[in-house]
Each structure stands twice: as C-alpha cells, then as structure tokens.
C-alpha cells in the first residue's frame, strides 16, 4: 500500500514539474534548475551574497545555486561547491564531487576553503524520499544538521547561512540550534517554492563564531 502511495506521489510530482511555470522559465533562460529562482528571491530580500564574497554550496548539483552565486560574487569572489552527484562545470566554481560525510572528501573540501573565511554557507540538500514520512523526516534533518555543522568549520564571524528545511519532526529543535549560533534567523517561503511542499528556507545571519 505504501509503495502504491509513493508511486502516485512520484507521478503527481512529475506532472507538476513539467507543468511548472518556473521549470519552463528556467528552460527558456538556459538555467540548470528552477531552484535558482528560490535563491535569487531570498538574496534580493536578504542580501546575503554580495560581490567579492566567498561562498560554499552544499548539495550543489545540478548547479542552479552555484550558477547564481558565481554571477553575484564576480571575479573577485569564490564559490566552492560539493555534491555526491556529478555536476557539469561552471566557470568560476570550484566543484568537488564526493560525499563530505567521508573524511577524505571533507578534508579535500576544507583544503579548498582554506580556513574559516567563508561569508555564506548555502545548502539546498534534500534526502531521497521513500514515502515513509518518519524515515524521510529523519534523513532530511540529518542533512541539515550536517550543513549547520559545516558552518562551525568554515564560516567567518558574522557570516550567513541559508538552508532548505522540511517542516515536521525536529524542525523546532533545529531552529533553536541555529539561533544558538547566529544572531538572527528568519524563515522564508519563496514564491517559486511549491505551495504544497513542506520546504522552507532558514536564513541565518550574524554567525557568532
């Protein structure tokens, strides 16, 4: 029964995806994914990413957020991206393919970052959904906890963090953990985020270091 529900949900997602105005807009503009519009909207509102900044993009593939960030930071900035999945090269983006939960990959990523000098950590990571709500929620929370932990390793004082989080079990605890290390934390639901989706974005600023 659960498998049938999962298949029905997957088909509904596909139907919505191909009829989505932001998917069509991304295709028309030659962009890698509709996710770029979410980051663009957040950045216009919160001004997280600015010219000359250094940015880390976790779960970067297919590259929509990196594509946007590198245009904003320009030649004097830096974008370091990482994903377990492959990603086509983007000029100006230093991409590392691998799972940063593995020590060797994490060491390689931290070497490229070279100290706590990052202005913005951003994460659009999401776990593969199985249809089991409790298991999916736990997997999703694990990923956002990893992203928050990365902030402690690479963010400079007063740096910023933007992360996709799914509302549900563990959400309030995660908000508290984020507020403990940032001066301000806001919740954003971009217009390009599907209304039915439980996803929101936390925008955290003023990293306490």
UniProtKB/Swiss-Prot annotation:
S-adenosyl-L-methionine binds at residues 63, 65, 83, 99, 124. It catalyses: uridine(2552) in 23S rRNA + S-adenosyl-L-methionine = 2'-O-methyluridine(2552) in 23S rRNA + S-adenosyl-L-homocysteine + H(+). Pfam families: FtsJ. Coiled coil: none annotated. It is found in: Cytoplasm. The keyword Transferase applies. Keywords: Cytoplasm, Methyltransferase, rRNA processing, S-adenosyl-L-methionine, Transferase. Its main location: cytoplasm. Its EC number is 2.1.1.166. It comes from the Bacteria. One of its GO terms (molecular function) is rRNA (uridine-2'-O-)-methyltransferase activity. The active site is at 164 (proton acceptor). CDD domains: AdoMet_MTases. The keyword Cell division does not apply. InterPro entries: RNA_methyltr_RlmE (IPR050082), RNA_MeTrfase_FtsJ_dom (IPR002877), rRNA-MeTfrase_E (IPR015507), SAM-dependent_MTases_sf (IPR029063). GO terms for cellular component: cytoplasm. Specifically methylates the uridine in position 2552 of 23S rRNA at the 2'-O position of the ribose in the fully assembled 50S ribosomal subunit. Belongs to the class I-like SAM-binding methyltransferase superfamily. RNA methyltransferase RlmE family. This is Ribosomal RNA large subunit methyltransferase E.
